[in-house]
Amino acid sequence: MTHDLRPGLRVYSHAGLEIGRIAEVRGDFFKVNAPRRPDFWVQAIDIIAETQAHDGVMLRRDAKHHAAPEHAE
């Protein structure tokens, strides 16, 4: 499944709680700006759904946090 990842999209946990917004996209990775906690990177394969309004994505329960990708396009 291909996702139109772009800054500003909301990011939700598998339970439906908003955890932040996409701050940056590098290739198949995106950075989540999470209020009250450090920002983190997630790989697009960890997305399980998009919101009906196409303004957000939901992450898998076991989504892994990654270091910033160096040379992703």
Question: PLM features: residue spans?
Answer:
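Peripheral interaction segments used for macromolecular assembly
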Residues: 1-73
